[in-house]
């Protein structure tokens, strides 16, 4: 689980990073599991998470992207995502990138091969690069790209049209008052 159910009792967006992958990151005694890949020192501070297919399955609540974001990941790369989770990522400032299984496997291999391996995700250019010649272009709806580039959520998007909304409300109120 991205975040176990016992940690879903709050509605604040922050503080969930400590519970991310809790059942894998920690053993039964609450000690850090050194075998869990993201716990290894070489991944400290990583902002890109690489995963297998159907990432986010069973995580329809927004707590999952809140935990991912709070932990420090800004991008998740996988061959596929659960639909609700995928949409919730955009609503919470996380870039989910769909690549082929072969491309994702190549990223896993590169990560294992090179110490201090770093992926560079360029949202403007819609590319993923590394220092070893990798260049992958990814597809992303332009509306969603702009949404992320501008740091918007649904409310922020609506507020961009505040003057038009107010003008409409005034016009409608004037018609109803006549």
Curated annotation (Swiss-Prot):
It catalyses: (2R,3S)-3-isopropylmalate = (2S)-2-isopropylmalate. InterPro entries: 3-IsopropMal_deHydase_ssu (IPR004431), Aconitase/3IPM_dehydase_swvl (IPR015928), AconitaseA/IPMdHydase_ssu_swvl (IPR000573), IPMI_Swivel (IPR033940), LeuD (IPR050075). It holds the Pfam family Aconitase_C. Transmembrane segments: none annotated. The keyword Amino-acid biosynthesis applies. GO terms for molecular function: 3-isopropylmalate dehydratase activity. The keyword Lyase applies. Its EC number is 4.2.1.33. Coiled coil: none annotated. GO terms for biological process: L-leucine biosynthetic process. It comes from the Bacteria. Keywords: Amino-acid biosynthesis, Branched-chain amino acid biosynthesis, Leucine biosynthesis, Lyase. It is an enzyme of class 4 (lyase). Pathway: Amino-acid biosynthesis; L-leucine biosynthesis; L-leucine from 3-methyl-2-oxobutanoate: step 2/4. One of its GO terms (cellular component) is 3-isopropylmalate dehydratase complex. Belongs to the LeuD family. LeuD type 1 subfamily. Catalyzes the isomerization between 2-isopropylmalate and 3-isopropylmalate, via the formation of 2-isopropylmaleate. Heterodimer of LeuC and LeuD. PANTHER family: 3-ISOPROPYLMALATE DEHYDRATASE SMALL SUBUNIT, 3-ISOPROPYLMALATE DEHYDRATASE SMALL SUBUNIT 2-RELATED-RELATED. This is 3-isopropylmalate dehydratase small subunit. It comes from Paenibacillus polymyxa (Bacillus polymyxa).
């Amino acid at each position: 689980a991205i975040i176990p159910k016992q940690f879903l009792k709050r509605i604040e967006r922050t503080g969930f990073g400590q519970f991310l992958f809790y059942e894998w990151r920690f053993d039964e005694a609450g000690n850090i599991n050194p075998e869990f890949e993201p716990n290894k020192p070489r991944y400290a501070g990583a902002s890109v998470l690489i995963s297998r297919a159907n990432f986010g399955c069973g995580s329809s609540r927004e707590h999952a992207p809140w935990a991912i974001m709070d932990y420090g990941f800004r991008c998740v790369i996988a061959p596929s995502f659960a639909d609700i989770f995928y949409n919730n990522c955009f609503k919470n400032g996380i870039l989910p990138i769909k690549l082929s299984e072969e491309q994702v496997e190549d990223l896993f291999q590169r990560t294992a091969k090179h110490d201090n391996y770093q992926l560079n995700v360029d949202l403007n250019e819609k590319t993923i690069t590394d220092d070893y010649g990798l260049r992958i272009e990814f597809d992303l709806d332009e509306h969603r790209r702009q949404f992320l580039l501008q740091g918007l959520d649904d409310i922020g998007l609506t507020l961009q049209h505040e003057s038009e909304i107010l003008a409409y409300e005034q016009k409608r109120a004037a018609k109803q008052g006549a």
